[in-house]
Every structure is written in structure tokens, then in C-alpha cells.
Amino acid sequence: MKKYILNILIFILFTSLSNSQNLDSLYVSRINDTILSKYLNEKRSIEIQLPRSYEANPDKKYPLMIVLDGDYMFNIVAGSVDYLSYWGDIPENLIVGINQKDTRFKDSSVLDNITHTPITSTASFYDFIVNEVIPYFSKNYRISKFRVILGQERTANFANFFLLKKNPVFQAVISISPKMSKNMNSYLSENLSKTNSKIIYTLSSSKKDFESIYKNVSELKNSLDSINNKNLKFESLIFDEENHYILPSLSVPKSIRSTYSMYSDIDKIEYDSIISNLEISPIDYLTNRYQLIKDFYDEDKTISMNDFMAIEEYIEENEFFDFYNDLSQLAKQEYPGTILPSYYRGRFIEETGDPKKAMYIYRSAYNMKEVKGLTKEYLLELANRIEEDFNY
């Protein structure tokens, strides 16, 4: 068994290092564009970053991430997304930065004196995003149903208004050091506690942030932490030393990674804290995990080899070999025509009392395709070892 676990660990390392291999020969494309808006009565400048694989995968749709304050926030967001997706921690995104250099206040902070919700120019900017920006990209680019909006300070508060609708047009909001308008904390708490939509909300500030912002963020954090709603995924990031202006340089990549935390492969922390203590079938755990990715991100993600190997390690460590049969069926569904289903089927047969049959299964996979981290030579090695051990 030790030999199997050693090989599994090698495979997991291999697949982790291989995440970038499909993207390392591709490059992002940036486009400067304008949208003529009837709501704003002007042309508004936008900057677009296409995913590395956009041209190479003409059938693939990508999450849309809209960056407010794009005149200074676009580069840090676009760079963070490209880096994290390059290593497979998050999916590739189509990034759109909206220039607000001279319009920040009127775009985001003109609010009703009683309800403290958008009016006049800020209501127009809201409609511009909902009725012009999103439809423009739905028509002209391949975007999925999962949309993210990100803002800082005034625009972070503005982004919160999208969560107050019954069916939000954004499924994720990244709110960095928000300058909260009056009633916003109670609005968010009330709406997020009862939302029936899948929502991911990431909030950040710092102890060295402006005092009023840090105070409001802390209060909102405490309120949202107490919400028990399976449709809401909330995380707060409170930094210790960063001031208001430095904060985005740390918060942006961490917030993006938090937004996509369910997307990344199983790591050692998840394995040690959750998988090693499972009270349900590990195959059920794995399929439920990927169903969450579908439910939250609208992404039909193929179960990674890393995650197959993590479940294999669990089976080997605990000697729960019967689970190999179900794992083989799952592998057949995810990697048809490859050696992976035969490998797991062979392990099931070998460990449940028919090594000779397992030997034939390993050898029968020789004409099938290999997968990352698992070779035909390794399966032949398993077959030869059985032949030697039992003198077949």
C-alpha cells in the first residue's frame, strides 16, 4: 500500500505542476473600446482583456468580470485573474474595466436623501451596466451566466446595490474598502439572509483603513457572519497594516481567489481537514463538490486528475477498496476512452480477491489514451508485478 500512496503523491504533484501547460503557449489580448450609451448620453471608454484560450476554444463561454474604477483598478484585476487562472486556481475570465476617471462621484454616489438608493446620474449608470454593458458582451463575446462586479470605496458601495434585487444580474460582488451609504448594512443583511439566488460576496478592509470605513465594514462583517443561508457564500478579509490606498494590491488577488474558492482543486488543507474525516462516500463528496461548481459558477468543470488522485489516496490510506468500483464508473464518465477507468477497475478487482482478472484489466488498457500523471507503463508494471507475485 505504501508504494501506491507514494505514486499517488507523485501524481498529485505532477498534475499540480501541469495546470499551466494548456495556457503557457497562449497570451491574453487587450482591446480598447467604447460603448455609446443612451443612459449616460455619452460614449464611455472600456478596456477588455480576453482570456488566453479565447481564440483557441471557440465553443467555450467565460465568466464576465466587470471592474469599476477601471482607469486605475483594471490592471491589477486583469493581472491577478490571468495569473490565478494560468495556474488553474480559478477559471479564465473575460475582464471589462469601465473608465470612471472624471465621473466617479456622479456614477456611484448620487443617492436619494430618504432611501439612500441611486437616483439621477447614479441610477443612469446602474441602468448603463444592466441594460447596455452586459447585453453588449452577451451579444459580441462568449460569456457564461456567471458575472462578477468589483469596486473600491465609492464604487464598492455602488456594487452592493446589485445585490438588493430579487434576481441579481451579478452572482458575485467583490467589495474593497467600501464607503457605505446610509442603510446599506441593513439592506444587505436583509436581502442576503433571504436570497434564493446563489450569491458570493467578498468584503475587505484593514485596521489601517479610514476609521469610518473599517468601522462599517466590521459591523457588516459581524452581521453577515450570522446569516445562515446555503445560497450565500460570504467571506471577509481584514488586513492589519495596509492603508486605504495600498489595500487593493493585496485584497484584489485574495478576493478573486476567495470568490472562486470552490473552483480550485483539492489541496492538502482540504484533504487533511475534510476528506480524511469523511462520514459519507468519498465519491459522493467529489461529485457534490463539482455540482457546487456548476451551481455557483455555471461551469461544467471536468473532475481534475488531482482530485481523482486525492480520493484514491483516501481509499488507499483507509483500505476502503470497494470504493474503487464507484470511482471507476466516475472515471469512465469523466475520462472516457482513457486508461483511468481500467486502472480503478483493476484496483477494485485486485483488492477484492481476483488478482488474475485485475492483471488482464491492466493489460487491456494498453490501447487506450493516457491521462496526466498515469501512464500505460505504470499499468503494465502493476500487471507484471501480479504475474510475478502469483506465478501466473
Language model features by range: what are they?
Residues 71-126:
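Active-site machinery of serine-nucleophile hydrolases
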Residues 145-192:
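Primarily recognizes the serine-hydrolase "nucleophile elbow" in alpha/beta-hydrolase
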Residues 228-292, 297-300:
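C-terminal catalytic histidine-bearing segment of alpha/beta-hydrolase fold enzymes
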Residues 181-242:
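The feature captures the conserved acid-bearing segment of alpha/beta-hydrolase catalytic domains
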Residues 313, 347-350, 381-388:
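Residue-level recognition of tetratricopeptide repeat
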